[in-house]
């Protein structure tokens, strides 16, 4: 979530050049595989910008996939001040040959019942309704900037398990690592199956969690320096 700009960008979002610069930076990402990356995206006429997800292909093409639906305005969050919400979750076709649902952070938390809200919609239920109408999704991805507190990973596990169970397919939560102003992001990205099985990455370390949808036990954690460090959390319990 907002990986290109950092979270939260606050009043920088009032500058059109800043948002355009984020999109240009996305186009400069060199990758042999397609990526989903969080970035602010330009607003529609007479609207604030969106908290978006971009598809970046190996040829450098950048396309907007979706925008965040649920904008939190409690505790450290003030997103409704800066963003306009989308009305539905995203679906991305043919990303590495896969069709995926796409949500952004809070979009998945409403379904778990763990956050105070008066939201009028539930993006996870929307995706579940679409799959019930014949939309075939291999998995759903959630791009997150989920700040750290002492029991936060336990909450994330509950969110992911609830979403995977309702959707009846794997649910992936990719969280930021590091600090931005007064917020700390602990990582602990994870993957959950409808059965409740979870594989989670370690905290406070940048890297890639590689998950085989057919065999969660074969998951690998590769650190940012390219070393294979298989100390992931197979059970998903907090450490």
Question: Where are the regions that the model predicts?
Answer:
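Enzyme catalytic cores with a strong preference for nitrogen-chemistry domains
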Residues: 1-239
């Amino acid at each position: 979530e907002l990986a290109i700009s950092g979270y939260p960008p606050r009043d920088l979002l009032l500058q059109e050049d800043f948002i355009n610069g984020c999109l240009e930076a996305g186009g400069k990402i060199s990758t042999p595989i397609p990526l989903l990356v969080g970035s602010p995206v330009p607003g529609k006429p007479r609207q604030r910008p969106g908290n978006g997800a971009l598809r970046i292909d190996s040829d450098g093409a950048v396309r907007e996939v979706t925008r965040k639906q649920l904008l939190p305005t409690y505790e450290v969050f003030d997103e409704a001040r800066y963003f306009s919400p989308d009305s539905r979750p995203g679906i991305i076709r043919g990303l590495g040959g896969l069709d995926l649902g796409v949500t952004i952070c809070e979009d998945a938390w409403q379904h778990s019942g763990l956050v105070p809200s008066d939201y009028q919609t539930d993006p996870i239920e929307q995706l579940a309704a679409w799959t019930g109408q014949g939309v075939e999704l291999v998995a759903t991805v959630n791009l997150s900037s989920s700040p750290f507190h002492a029991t936060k990973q336990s909450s994330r596990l509950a969110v992911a398990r609830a979403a995977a169970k309702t959707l009846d397919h794997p649910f992936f939560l990719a969280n930021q690592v590091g600090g931005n102003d007064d917020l700390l992001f602990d990582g602990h990205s994870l993957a959950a199956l409808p059965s409740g099985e979870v594989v989670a990455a370690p905290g406070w370390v940048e890297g890639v969690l590689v998950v085989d949808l057919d065999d969660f036990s074969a998951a690998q954690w590769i650190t940012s320096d390219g070393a294979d460090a298989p100390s992931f959390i197979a059970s998903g319990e907090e450490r």
